[in-house]
Amino acid sequence: MEEIQRYLQPDRSQQHNFLYPLIFQEYIYALAHDHGLNRNRSVLLENPGYNNKFSLLIVKRLITRMYQQNHFLISTNDSNKNAFLGCNKSLYSQMISEGFAFIVEIPFSLRLISSLSSFEGKKIFKSHNLRSIHSTFPFLEDNFSHLNYVLDILIPYPVHLEILVQTLRYWVKDASSLHLLRFFLHEYWNLNSLITSKKPGYSFSKKNQRFFFFLYNSYVYECESTFVFLRNQSSRLRSTSFGALLERINFYGKMERLVEVFTKDFQVTLWLFKDPFMHYVRYQEKSILASKGTFLLMNKWKFYLVNFWQCHFSLCFHTGRIHINQLSNHSRDFMGYLSSVRLNPSMLRSQMLENSFLINNAIKKFDTLVPIIPLIGSLAKANFCTVLGHPISKPVWSDLSDSDIIDRFGRICRNLFHYYSGSSKKXTLYRIKYILRLSCARTLARKHKSTVRTFLKRSGSELLEEFLTSEEQVLSLTFPRASSSLWGVYRSRIWYLDIFCINXLANYQ
């Protein structure tokens, strides 16, 4: 990164104009290869012979070959042939896109470094706490119980390819890089591997996730520019490629600027954007905009967002992708949890002098529940049970050792308990534990050609210990005869700051 900074440093006024030559630097592909190890398998791992073949001459030839292709003469048989150095059409495009994805992130990385360096002598909180999915739920728990209505929003799709290029023009001012980006987009659009519009959200190529996640986050960042007028109560999860602190700095900077503009030119509509009880949360393609206002106010917000996205992105955005729901009468699926705000009635006895009377109070409480039916559907899809929730064996794992089979089932169970530790009612999780434990026993019994009853008698205690969660292990070791109050602490909601992605079984959509 220091070498890249020196490369871009000579002229600060044009520091974004030198990205294209970086494509021909060999160390860029080494850096992209190292970053690929942390996310997904790199093309260099799948093709070990290419790690010594990245050079300026080869990259120039690859780009030339890409631009000189006659797409009208390519048949289905030609797409499987080796075009250059033993790689096919999609593979050598991927070789350059890996390096290109790393290069276009440089302006964002340098901006983040400069933002962090501006906090001289100040202690900055750890940014990974902001990255945690569970960090959003305490925010919802503290604020949503006081609100009335919520807008459930799906990010508009599909977007025109040229809009993606124009979005990056504000950050990457290198015409050559933008031309190459435009070529990549049209190339993958023709291969039907960039964006799939058959379902809500986006489906990315598995081999170029870093590149496509960067484009998607840039697009979402532009979509969220309409929310810059929200106050600092807003909570936003980090995008995949952007730093959380960088997003907040840009967010509040735009907020102050837009408020000044509306104060000067749009006095009449300013009240709509200065709602002090407006909160916004987003993860993946879903967004939540909640307010203490009336239904009429939320309806104005709905049509404002529809008109803004239609005009700004030149797409047909249907109003059906934004739903107005009352918090007290609606449950929403968000990040694998089924969350709602319900009225919790309580009876209080009051006494004034010699007279006593009862008072009924209804307190709003934010609930987070485990969606049992979709979760059982995910287990059934993974062949752990039937669609009705009856445990079955996993024949694919029958060739593994007994310890590996028990460890795999136990790890899945512990991960689910860890992810759903914030559930208000954890009785559902014990049904999931029962399914996984009995599925494990059936798999082992199938392997040893015996019955489940016989196997459980032989190794029941060992199997039980493997399925204990971390909280249960601590309580059972520290307090062998734990009181009901201690187990009540375990049954309470616990939010962890080390969860950065949705559990694979919880992400059932």
Curated annotation (Swiss-Prot):
PANTHER family: MATURASE K. Transmembrane segments: none annotated. The keyword RNA-binding applies. HAMAP family: MatK (MF_01390). It comes from Nicotiana rustica (Aztec tobacco). One of its GO terms (molecular function) is RNA binding. It comes from the Eukaryota. Belongs to the intron maturase 2 family. MatK subfamily. It is found in: Plastid, Chloroplast. This is Maturase K. Its main location: plastid. Usually encoded in the trnK tRNA gene intron. Probably assists in splicing its own and other chloroplast group II introns. GO terms for cellular component: chloroplast. Disulfide bonds: none annotated. It holds the Pfam family Intron_maturas2. The keyword Plastid applies. One of its GO terms (biological process) is RNA splicing.
